[in-house]
């Protein structure tokens, strides 16, 4: 049984990570165009850096920990692969590292990772836990003033290509089980993954509420991921 999992903001919200986008579509009072686009970064890098600095600090708060859903997914993956039951890929839209901290191995972070930065010139990626600013030196050339400010958050902004689309499509087309957890069903291309799964694939959506994509699933489970995912995965482990 080849398994494909897709997770969104809903699974991390239960760990205390806010979704940031409010009912008016604003991110902490800012329009998306200001803090989550290449154009916004070019116009006001200080604002964008501070926005992500705040998010990075919040993620590093010791109170932010993987919840029962993250742990259940990691345990299921380990058992699934150890017993040779098929392929497993966890695709997340989240930029936190809670899946990895829970022990998940085959994680594809399609929107990047908050605890990484990328050089705008070389595309090199570096692990990063501190703040960023327009004066931050390059980690490999700290004395080169021409390289100051060349780092940006390694996250996918609106208008940029998500990571790993070919790998995701390949996993979707051969999936026997597809579970979407805590996703809005409106952000593409993630929202279109369910349509790439084959006819025999069992498609399950786990969310607090209905989404625009709910009708594409064979089953919908309404409830908190930390409650529903352990129960659901226990069912498949026992099969």
Curated annotation (Swiss-Prot):
Family designation: Belongs to the sirtuin family. Class III subfamily.
Protein name: NAD-dependent protein deacylase
Reactions catalysed according to its record: N(6)-acetyl-L-lysyl-[protein] + NAD(+) + H2O = 2''-O-acetyl-ADP-D-ribose + nicotinamide + L-lysyl-[protein]; N(6)-succinyl-L-lysyl-[protein] + NAD(+) + H2O = 2''-O-succinyl-ADP-D-ribose + nicotinamide + L-lysyl-[protein]
Keywords, alphabetical: Cytoplasm, NAD, Transferase
GO molecular function, one term: protein-malonyllysine demalonylase activity
Domain description: 2 residues (Tyr-52 and Arg-55) present in a large hydrophobic pocket are probably involved in substrate specificity. They are important for desuccinylation activity, but dispensable for deacetylation activity.
Keyword NAD: yes
Ranges of residues in domain Deacetylase sirtuin-type: 1-239
Residues involved in substrate binding: 52, 55
InterPro entries (UniProt xref): DHS-like_NAD/FAD-binding_dom, NAD-dep_sirtuin_deacylases, Sirtuin, Sirtuin_cat_small_dom_sf, Sirtuin_class_III, Ssirtuin_cat_dom
Domain of life: Bacteria
GO cellular component entries: cytoplasm
Active-site residues annotated for this sequence: 111 (proton acceptor)
EC number(s) reported in the record: 2.3.1.286
Uppermost EC category: transferase
Subcellular location: Cytoplasm
Main location: cytoplasm
Binding site for NAD(+): 8-27, 93-96, 182-184, 207-209, 225
Function, in words: NAD-dependent lysine deacetylase and desuccinylase that specifically removes acetyl and succinyl groups on target proteins. Modulates the activities of several proteins which are inactive in their acylated form.
